[in-house]
């Protein structure tokens, strides 16, 4: 907080809007997001937060979906400035910010790791998706970018979103690796359903219907915790696949 004066930064974004990286994209993204279920969400405050972050972290490219995180933090804190500092800390002190630098190299790494874990732990589902020409990057990208905060608008008890807060606790402790585990748990939970759908239905279900599903409601909390406990993904497996990915990239670079 000592290095950044939020009020001054916001004033700068309004006085010199041309200096805001991705300013036009941010405004467009926020304004077209459907917040109809929550009339209290202040779009201008969300835009202020995202524009300010864009100035403070020019090396991090804004990505569609970050607006959900800003809206989530704004709602749970009730304070625009506090939401800004929390999001700034998220970008600077966790591995989340690294997803959006250097040609999205880290995000691509997690796509690879996720697909390999899916192949190892849920081979039938993996093959079913492959037969239907569905790449995991089609649907897990929003999971990493929004950290599942796109589910927040559909949660009944937003004053105490148990599952989303549990996911964030895990993320703050383990970083983006926790999103791998949550994502695989989601696919495990919905595996029978997914394998009954065709190409278009699968994509619609994974991208649009899961965020609105009972999975993220407080009533599903106990079942979700059982899934997390019983369906473990060893950190050593993730590390081995990350090493595999780095070797693969080195070989490709030498070609």
Describe the residue ranges of each PLM region.
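C-terminal regulatory/linker segments that are acidic, Ser/Thr- and Pro-rich
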Residues: 134, 184-255
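Internal, helix-rich recognition cores of eukaryotic regulatory domains
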Residues: 1-214
């Amino acid at each position: 907080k000592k290095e950044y004066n939020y009020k001054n930064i916001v004033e700068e974004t309004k006085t010199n809007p041309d200096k805001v990286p991705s300013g036009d994209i941010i405004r467009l993204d926020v304004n077209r997001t459907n917040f109809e279920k929550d009339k209290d969400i202040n779009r201008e405050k969300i835009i202020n937060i995202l524009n300010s972050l864009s100035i403070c972290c020019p090396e991090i490219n804004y990505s569609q979906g970050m607006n959900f995180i800003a809206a989530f933090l704004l709602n749970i804190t009730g304070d625009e400035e506090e939401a800004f500092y929390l999001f700034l800390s998220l970008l600077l002190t966790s591995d989340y910010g690294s997803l959006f630098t250097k040609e999205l190299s880290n995000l691509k790494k997690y796509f690879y790791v996720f697909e390999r874990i899916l192949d190892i732990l849920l081979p039938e589902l993996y093959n079913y998706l492959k037969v239907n020409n569905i790449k995991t990057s089609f649907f897990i990208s929003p999971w990493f970018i929004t950290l599942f905060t796109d589910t927040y608008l559909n949660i009944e008890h937003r004053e105490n979103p148990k599952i989303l807060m549990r996911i964030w606790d895990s993320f703050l402790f383990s970083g983006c690796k926790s999103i791998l585990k949550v994502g695989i748990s989601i696919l495990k939970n919905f595996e029978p359903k997914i394998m009954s759908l065709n190409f278009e239905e699968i994509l619609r279900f994974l991208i649009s219907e899961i965020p609105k599903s009972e999975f993220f409601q407080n009533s599903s909390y106990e079942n979700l915790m059982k899934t997390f406990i019983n369906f473990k993904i060893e950190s050593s497996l993730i590390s081995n696949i990350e090493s595999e990915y780095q070797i693969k990239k080195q070989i490709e670079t030498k070609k």
